[in-house]
């Protein structure tokens, strides 16, 4: 899980600064409530009674939940007259007696909305709008057939549209193994894509109109615009849809229609190459074209590509500690947090730098605060560039705190660690250190930092363990005394790494 923290953190940072869906203001009403209220006493029985029911898991204190509430209620009112009626329900997941329900349904944030089908046998995430009209339209589609029939060219034009990925199956008849597999996959993926089927390829706006099927045609608003497949093995068909629906280069800007592709980009297991340029400057289109050409060369080699407009990417700049004067720049991040960075990129350097990266000739980039020129306080300051030397190469027993400057618990612990460090000042075998985890990279394959403060202890012999004991001076000292090794370095000064000159272009400012 730790390996994905950096990726999800960046995704959150990116999307946080993009204009989001505007919710209607909450209004009070004495009208009948159409949203069912469920809890641990009636949840399972209610879900089992319905072929299709939507459940919101919420918390009363959640601002987004409060904004959603009137829209959700309005949608429930409208859908109550649908034939058949679509039932919307809610669970207060903040209530102690409902927390098992929240855990059972993998609720990790609020609001979380789930669609339960077939009495709860099939569960899907709700991925639709959060205003009443959008909720109604989305759930009408979700409660209907997984795939709709296209009977005319007008049907096809309306279905395909201009800015989304849709999948159409062309069949000589609506029966047989190929058709059954297509419908089964449509049912599985219906919350992610729109599916349709037809007996006549001539209705479709693009592609070979003479085919009689069976064939699957995927339409998309990017790259080659449509692509066909005749492999109806369910796994192969799902792989075809997943790969074909991903842009060769994902675009990140203020256009909401691009956001699903951005989410898909960050959910990919691939390494993630991100080129940041100013879309409005001269030469931007040349960069995009060259980047697309290079991306095509590497699209089957474990790298996904994104191009971001600087104006829309301030979250990424804060996350990585980048500066606008380094644009054009490219940064590649692995799921383990390792990064590779090239600032002030020239157009003709793009293919050669990426080739050097693929050949393993580019050194990883470490986000780091400047190495302190003086480090004389009892608790030693460690930064990204000195972490390896202080913790792993010093031959000392090192207790290191990973903290955040804004963290209240860290502030409470700070004077205690000072006292611990003072207690060991005469013992050169022991180092008490701290690292600002918001401004310096941490090797996530070594340290699992899920919250602040997180403390680790590495003995002189190399044994690494996370400290989860009491946070009093006495508890921490007792732990160190029990776990430290003798190094024979007593009465010698602890050597601190010297400050090194840092190239301006290669060391971004680290402010998060």
From Swiss-Prot:
Site (Lowers pKa of C-terminal Cys of second active site): 471
S-S bridge residues: 62-65, 407-410
Localization per Swiss-Prot or TrEMBL: Endoplasmic reticulum lumen
Alphabetical UniProt keywords: Disulfide bond, Endoplasmic reticulum, Glycoprotein, Isomerase, Redox-active center, Repeat, Signal
Repeat found in the keyword field: yes
Residues listed as glycosylation sites in the UniProt record: 278
Pfam families from the UniProt entry: Thioredoxin (PF00085), Thioredoxin_6 (PF13848)
Repeat among keywords: yes
Site (Contributes to redox potential value): 63-64, 408-409
Active-site residue numbers: 62 (nucleophile), 65 (nucleophile), 407 (nucleophile), 410 (nucleophile)
Span(s) of short sequence motif Prevents secretion from ER: 509-512
GO MF, one annotated term: protein disulfide isomerase activity
Region entry Disordered, spans: 487-512
UniProt site (Lowers pKa of C-terminal Cys of first active site): 130
Biased segments, Basic and acidic residues type: 487-496
Domain Thioredoxin: 25-144, 357-485
Domain of life (superkingdom): Eukaryota
Biological process according to GO: protein folding; response to endoplasmic reticulum stress
Reaction it catalyzes: Catalyzes the rearrangement of -S-S- bonds in proteins
EC class name: isomerase
Signal peptide start-end: 1-24
Family label: Belongs to the protein disulfide isomerase family.
Protein name per Swiss-Prot or TrEMBL: Protein disulfide-isomerase
Provenance organism: Medicago sativa
């Amino acid at each position: 899980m730790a390996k994905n923290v950096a990726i999800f953190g960046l995704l959150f940072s990116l999307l946080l600064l993009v204009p989001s869906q505007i919710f209607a203001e909450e209004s009070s009403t004495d009208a009948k409530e159409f949203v069912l209220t469920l809890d641990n006493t009636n949840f399972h029985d209610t879900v089992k009674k319905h072929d299709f029911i939507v459940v919101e898991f919420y918390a009363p204190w959640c601002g987004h939940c409060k904004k959603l509430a009137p829209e959700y209620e309005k949608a429930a009112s409208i859908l109550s007259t649908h034939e058949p009626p679509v039932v919307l329900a809610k669970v207060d997941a903040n209530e102690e007696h409902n927390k098992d329900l929240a855990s059972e349904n993998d609720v990790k944030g609020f609001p979380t909305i789930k669609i339960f089908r077939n009495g709860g046998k099939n569960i899907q995430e709700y991925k639709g709008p959060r205003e009443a009209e959008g909720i109604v339209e989305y759930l009408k589609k979700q409660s209907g057939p997984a795939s709709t029939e296209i009977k005319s060219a007008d049907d096809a034009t309306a279905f395909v549209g201009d800015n989304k990925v849709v999948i159409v199956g062309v069949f000589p008849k609506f029966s047989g193994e190929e058709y059954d597999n297509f419908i089964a996959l449509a049912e599985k993926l219906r919350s992610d894509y729109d599916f349709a089927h037809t007996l006549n390829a001539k209705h479709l706006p693009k592609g070979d109109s003479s085919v009689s099927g069976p064939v699957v045609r995927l339409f998309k608003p990017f790259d080659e615009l449509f692509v066909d497949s005749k492999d109806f093995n369910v796994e192969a068909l799902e792989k075809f849809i997943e790969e074909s629906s991903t842009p060769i280069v994902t675009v990140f800007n203020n256009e909401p229609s691009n956001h699903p592709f951005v989410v898909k980009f960050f959910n990919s297991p691939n390494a993630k190459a991100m080129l940041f340029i100013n879309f409005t400057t001269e030469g931007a289109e040349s960069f995009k074209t060259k980047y697309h050409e290079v991306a095509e060369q590497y699209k089957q080699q474990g790298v996904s590509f994104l191009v971001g407009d600087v104006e829309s990417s301030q979250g990424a700049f804060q996350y990585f500690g980048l500066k606008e004067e380094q644009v054009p720049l490219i940064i590649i991040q692995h799921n383990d947090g390792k990064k590779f960075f090239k600032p002030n990129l020239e157009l003709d350097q793009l293919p050669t730098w990426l080739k050097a990266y693929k050949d393993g000739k580019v050194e990883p980039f470490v986000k780091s605060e400047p190495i302190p020129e003086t480090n004389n306080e009892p608790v030693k300051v460690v930064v990204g560039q000195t972490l390896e030397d202080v913790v792993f190469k010093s031959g000392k027993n090192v207790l290191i705190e990973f903290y955040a400057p804004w963290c209240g618990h860290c502030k409470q612990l700070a004077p205690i660690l000072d006292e611990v460090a003072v207690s060991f000042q005469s013992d050169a075998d022991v180092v008490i250190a701290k690292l600002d985890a918001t401004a310096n990279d941490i090797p996530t394959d070594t340290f699992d930092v899920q919250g602040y403060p997180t403390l680790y202890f590495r003995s002189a012999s190399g044994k690494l363990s996370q400290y989860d004991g009491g946070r009093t001076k006495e508890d921490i000292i007792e732990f160190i005394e029990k776990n430290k090794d003798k190094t024979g370095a007593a009465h010698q000064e602890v050597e601190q790494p010297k400050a090194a000159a840092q190239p301006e272009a290669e060391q971004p400012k680290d402010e998060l």
